[in-house]
Amino acid sequence: MPILNSKNLKNILITGGAGFIGSNLIKELLMNHKFNKIISIDNYSTGRKSNHHKNKKVEYVKLDCRKIFENKKVLNFKPQYIFHFGEFSRVVPSFDLAHDCLDNNISGTYNVLKYALRNKSKLIYSTSSMSIGDKKNENLSLYAWTKAKNFELIRNFDRWYGLNYTSVCFFNVFGENQISTGPMASVIGIFERQYRNRKPLTIVRPGTQKRDFTHIEDAVNGAILSAKKGSKKMYFIGSGKSYSILNITKKFKTKIKYIPKRPGEKFTGKAKLYLSSKELGYKSRYNLESYIKNFIKNTKI
């Protein structure tokens, strides 16, 4: 389903366009949708040039969201849609890198909101299931707190200034181009790397933590549907099924190793898809179990 009317081609700005979700979004837009031009801005803290798509309709700009008004090319661009995926995005590192998390997420997003208002753009904000917290506790970590406060700020910008927005709440996205090394690595990315290297899969104690996992293609589809149909709400994008971390590791059929508890750990997580299904027509098409089976089948160790 094309996101845009082919008779009225639109400009699209994507923050974090060289990152995991952003690069897959650009891939999908290039393959199946009509638009005028995409500009990706990324500070490349986790984004990679290897994620770039060579296409004359896509331009990559190395730029931090906090400096979005300092680049003439971006300043003169008039996007109808802004997909804001360029934020500090992990729980545990937010404790040690508190300044980076706070400055990137609060100051960076504030500038993106001003830019969206200036251009009368529709903002598609990527929040996180971690910002909901256990029992709606957003204070588990600085990362979760900043994501929750940014969504609150976005809603207030609508009340105060008439910001056009929608939000997608992703649940543990996995798949092509996911980060597998370093402090920003995702859990499935880490398990895949450990499996390839014949290392035990590391489980943060106690291992009973439950997560909903979302395939990258479902995440991208949810973001596009939200851009097209979403209206000033938060839409959950997930599979609607939760797995314990221990249960996931068992599907790899290899050795496991427990590691100490970490701060900010969330123990429950399952996407409630009623609103996304009703208003966006979203439906999860991929599941984690099949993905892991295919990964093991196609991985030689």
Model-identified regions with their sequence ranges:
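Short aromatic-enriched loop/helix-cap "lid" or pocket-rim segments at secondary-structure transitions
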Residues: K49-H53, K136-N137, Q178-P183, I216, ...
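C-terminal substrate-binding subdomain of Rossmann-fold SDR/epimerase-dehydratase oxidoreductases
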Residues: L4, D64, R196-I301
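N-terminal Rossmann-like NAD(P)+-binding domain of SDR-like oxidoreductases, especially those catalyzing
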Residues: M1-V173, K293-T299
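NAD(P)-dependent short-chain dehydrogenase/reductase
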Residues: L142-A144, E152-R211, I216-N221, L225-A227, ...
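Short, surface-exposed alpha-helical segments at coil->helix boundaries
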Residues: K49-S50, F151, G189, S242, ...
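Residue-level signature of the cytosolic catalytic core of signaling kinases
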Residues: K54, E138, S180-M184, G230, ...
